[in-house]
Amino acid sequence: NPSENSYGNDQSYNSNISVDIMKKYTEALNYLLGSNKHKAVLDDMTIVFWAMEPEETCEDLFSQLIWSQADQMNAEDTEAMLKKLVEDANAGYLTEQRLASMEEIHPDVDFYMLGLKPNSSRLSVKFLIRRKYADVLWNIARFQRELQITREVKPVYLSWIKKELISPKSKNDKVNPALMARQFEAMIYGCDYPNALLETMVRRVRIDSGRKKMNDVRIGVIKACLNRKNVGEEIKVALDKENTNQAYLCGRLFAILERLQQEASNYSLNRTVKDAYFASASTRPLLVFPKLINLANQSYLKKAQYPMFYNKLIGEVMVKLNGGFPDHFSLKEQGEFIVGYYQQNQAFYEKKNQEDREDERYGTGK
């Protein structure tokens, strides 16, 4: 069509970008793609990032907090830095003094993130984000704070999250690229995580078996998704005995009943109530819990070494449940059940570890 051929130019020569500019941006992109300081790969999407300043400190910290691939920071430096950032996120702000102390980082520097995906013979741009570095760092600190599930602050990397979205038995290590892109944007912008992230992680916990069923990363992601949606009802880092959420309480109760069963059998069981009932208890509690309570009263409590301790724990939770169980749990409530279960279990392990340390200290251990 002659009307589309401006000044007699056609195809790529009929463009609002000159050949000179094309060569320059191609050279710049190739430099970014060739530098590990400016690039990270998330499945089949490549993310390049850069700050509008000559020093590469911003990129280094960004890489270390999300991908663990910085040149200038080791694991100890990262954990120390993350602890300070999480403290600021807990307080609800990120101080300029903190940024100023971070190796001469300037909070007003423009920071760019570009998501690229190969598409046939071309590159497809998934996103282009430009933000002040202080805003980026604040949202990463918030992201890391929400993922913490123990009092010991440790960084959680995107590659770890991606791994936990996949069944350990699966030979396919691919995750929906749209899900990973939306998760990345939620981290950078501070908006809600995609519903598919919570749905996938809850499904993995319910369906998978063995030790890989639950871990800090999976439970941390579930907690993070819930807390961004539950305005004014935040799930804490560790066990919260004051939490009266019905699903959270049912999760705690399930952990107590499982622990009671294990103690009643002197920890000799290869299969516990978790293996038999966890999936159904987290979705249809009314169908499962009356049966488990009867088992506890008729068998487990009679054989346990400390029946009064468990009877007291069960009673404390049952009082807050008003003696009844919901008929079913929504996806959100299934997540709350899982976190309640995990945190109650962690509290048991922490108590056991503390007792073991005291036995060693006073020479009373076996």
Description of each model-found segment:
Residues 1-366:
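Extended alpha-helical scaffolding segments
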